[in-house]
UniProtKB/Swiss-Prot annotation:
UniProt keyword Membrane present: no
Keywords of the record: ATP-binding, Chaperone, Nucleotide-binding, Phosphoprotein, Stress response
Region annotation (Disordered) ranges: 589-608
Lineage: Bacteria, Bacillati, Actinomycetota, Actinomycetes, Mycobacteriales
Function description: Acts as a chaperone.
Name assigned to this protein: Chaperone protein DnaK
Length: 622
């Protein structure tokens, strides 16, 4: 069965993790890094670059490089490249495809399932767009999980013996969340969450860019905002400066040849940015994190002193000003620093993927009922309908009410297990009852029925008792994109993957051919320049020269089949040359005789073999 992974699809960087022997492991990408920049670029030769390679070429390919697209998730943003429109889910899918490939390379097997995290403050459209991106990337998205919940799982705080109140402060590249969770005796409950989907590290970078633009304009009179390439260089320098100021009191920003003046003379940007100045120009951004924190505290009605642990998530929380603000808001509590804030969410997602793996859609097949069967109800609680050790066949029903006013549908999630919180049990499947008439919360009555036959097959139905409407089990794939659009994007992604494979194969063939040409030319040259002349006839060397010329001619073109053919011929001629040299060397040795008077240069008895043991001195001395 294919493995499932946990993915943190971030604004600035993305991370993938997988369970190995029950423990989560962050997977390094093909470039050797544990984080992958969420950057996608369309090169002019048709190649699509993702991650660090895309980020590296951004300066020279500004208009065809996409970054921070997560900020547009769920909206109608799109970009047109070479007369083709790309949506946010499509661009995000490119990042997910790379993470998928890197994880498959690490595991040595295919990956089909994934848990993908989103900010807790994401709305339904943003969550669906994230799920669409996963589908386009060829992933079966088991669940969209809130980042604070994943972070709490990764920190292992859900294993505490006593009740604990956890504050998760998540400041990423483009979004901000603060959530309060109550944890105890295996129960994990999100009490309240608040945030800002347009506040993150990118905004701090933008302030530094604005500061640099103003400084340069003041000294040169030139407005760099009109130069896209210069602005990309400023953005990269700003991000680097922000990171350096987390550990230093000041940093130098030096960008040679940033632009030219009216006389075409090159101009240089050289500024010194102190941590104090950086904090001054970004103070209002920091202050924007206060209101969501205060909102969460007010919504739960707890005191700041009741917070037991503070968890920092997201690379932007490394900024000293952010850490100090969190300590101030929480009454001086030191944040928990047990896990890398860049990786903690992906680690939690991998743990959640381990919980959810094994889901079967539409038909739930159980060999026996050793564990209780139930559904998730409000607060994430596991409500049991059939207790463990129940004799089958059996049929049980229970009536539930809606949790919100005018709730139009009910998502029925079926679990197996004994834990009190549904998420801690095994998710077997889910389906949705739609078309519930508008009514205040608690008025609509939904009857859920579990029917287990003698074969152990479980059938689950949900019925609105008011209208008599009944739905069969089906996984609802409601989408911001139509099914046809998603199918088209999936096919495009698959075709692109095939193109990538072809390009890599072509590059490998070219590299092999070029290496063979170089080595062969060098070998032939050494033979001709050898003392006493070459040991093989000139016509043999000429044949090799001809094969080398043919290979070079093929390499100058684009026909890979021709390159392979020329390389094969060159390989044969090279082998023939090697054989000729070997035979010539043997003939010379035979003609000259050898020490000891034996033809062929062997001493008498040289063919005798002596058996011996190799003794380890250390072992012998013991």
């Amino acid at each position: 069965m294919a493995r499932a992974v946990g993915i943190d699809l971030g604004t600035t960087n993305s991370v993938v993790a997988v369970l190995e022997g029950g423990d989560p492991v962050v997977v390094a990408n093909s470039e050797g890094s544990r984080t992958t920049p969420s950057v996608v670029a369309f090169a002019r030769n048709g190649e699509v670059l993702v991650g660090q390679p895309a980020k590296n070429q951004a300066v020279t390919n500004v208009e065809r490089t996409m970054r921070s697209v997560k900020r547009h998730m769920g909206g109608d943003w799109s970009i047109e490249i070479d007369d083709k429109k790309y949506t946010t889910p499509e661009i995000s899918a490119r990042v997910l495809m790379k993470l998928k490939r890197d994880a498959e390379a690490y595991l040595g097997e295919d990956i089909a399932d994934a848990v993908i995290t989103v900010p807790a403050y994401f709305n339904d459209a943003q969550r669906q767009a994230t799920k669409d991106a996963g589908q386009i990337a060829g992933l079966n998205v088991l669940r969209i999980v809130n980042e604070p919940t994943a972070a709490a799982l990764a920190y292992g705080l859900d294993k505490g013996e006593k009740d604990q109140t956890i504050l998760v402060f998540d400041l990423g590249g483009g979004t901000f969340d603060v959530s309060l969770l109550e944890i105890g005796e295996g129960v994990v409950e999100v009490r309240a969450t608040s945030g800002d989907n347009h506040l993150g590290g990118d905004d701090w970078d933008d302030r530094v860019v604005e500061w640099l633009v103003d400084k340069f304009k003041g000294t040169s009179g030139i407005d760099l905002t009109k130069d896209k390439m210069a602005m990309q260089r400023l953005r990269e320098a700003a991000e680097k400066a922000k990171i350096e100021l987390s550990s230093s009191q000041s940093t130098s920003i030096n960008l040679p040849y940033i632009t030219v003046d009216a006389d075409k003379n090159p101009l240089f940007l050289d500024e010194q940015l102190t941590r104090a100045e950086f904090q001054r120009i970004t103070q209002d951004l920091l202050d924007r994190t206060r209101k969501p924190f205060q909102s969460v505290i007010a919504d739960t009605g707890i005191s700041v002193s009741d917070i037991d642990h503070v968890v920092l998530v997201g690379g932007s929380t490394r900024m000293p000003a952010v850490t100090e603000l969190v300590k101030e808001l929480t009454g001086g509590k030191e944040p928990n620093k047990g896990v890398n804030p860049d990786e903690v969410v992906a680690v939690g997602a991998a743990l959640q993927a381990g919980v959810l793996k094994g889901e079967v859609k539409d038909v739930l097949l159980l060999d026996v009922t050793p564990l209780s069967l139930g559904i998730e109800t409000k607060g994430g609680v596991m409500t049991k309908l059939i207790e463990r050790n129940t004799t089958i066949p059996t049929k049980r029903s229970e009536t539930f009410t809606t949790a919100d006013d005018n709730q139009p549908s009910v998502q029925i999630q079926v679990y197996q297990g004994e834990r009190e919180i549904a998420a801690h049990n095994k998710l077997l499947g889910s389906f949705e009852l739609t078309g519930i008439p508008p009514a205040p919360r608690g008025v609509s009555q939904i009857e859920v029925t579990f029917d287990i036959d003698a074969n152990g097959i479980v059938h689950v139905t949900a019925k609105d008792k008011g209208t008599g409407k009944e739905n069969t089990i089906r996984i609802q794939e409601g989408s911001g994109l139509s099914k046809d659009e998603i199918d088209r994007m999936i096919k495009d992604a698959e075709a692109h993957a095939a193109e990538d494979h072809k390009r890599r194969e072509e590059a490998d063939v070219r590299n092999q051919a070029e290496t063979l040409v170089y080595q062969t030319e060098k070998f032939v040259k050494e033979q001709r320049e050898a003392e006493g002349g070459s040991k093989v006839p000139e016509d043999t060397l000429n044949k090799v020269d001809a094969a080398v010329a043919e290979a070079k001619s093929a390499l100058a073109g684009t026909d890979i089949a021709a390159i392979k053919s020329a390389m094969e011929k060159l390989g044969q001629e090279s082998q023939a040359l090697g054989q000729a040299i070997y035979e010539a060397t043997q003939a010379d040795a035979a003609a000259a005789g050898a020490p000891g008077g034996q033809p062929g240069g062997a001493e008498p008895g040289a063919d005798d073999v002596v058996d011996a043991e190799v003794v380890d001195d250390d072992q012998e001395s013991k």
